[in-house]
Amino acid sequence: MEWVVEKQLVCPSTGTFFALVSSARNLKLILWYKGSYFIRNGNILNTGYFGVNINGRARNIEIIHAFPFNPVLWNTFKSTMSCPGNDALLSCECNLAESCLFKICPYGIRPLKE
C-alpha cells in the first residue's frame, strides 16, 4: 500500500519518530517508528511483504505502532515533545541537546554553544 507523509515529529526523550501518513483513499494513520532514517513531509512509503520502502528504497525503520489519525492525539504528541524542529524552527539552535537521545539531530539543528 502507498502512503504519503503529511507531517512528522521527533521525540528526543525516546529517540523515536512519529509520521502522519495518508493513503489514496484518504485513510490517515500516525506511525510511531524507530530507525536510522527520518521520514519527511512528501516522502512516499510503500508497505508490503518486502517491509517498508521510502521513495522506492528500502530503509532501516521499524514501525512500533500505527494509530488511526486523530487531531487531538497528534496535537497531544506535538505538545509533549520538546524539540524545536517539531515547530519548524529550523534556523535556531537547540538548547535541549543534552537530554536528546539522537546523536545527530534529524532536523539538522545545531546544539546551543555555551
Task: Please report, for each region that a protein language model flagged, where it lies by residue.
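Short solvent-exposed strand/turn elements
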Residues: 22-28, 80, 87
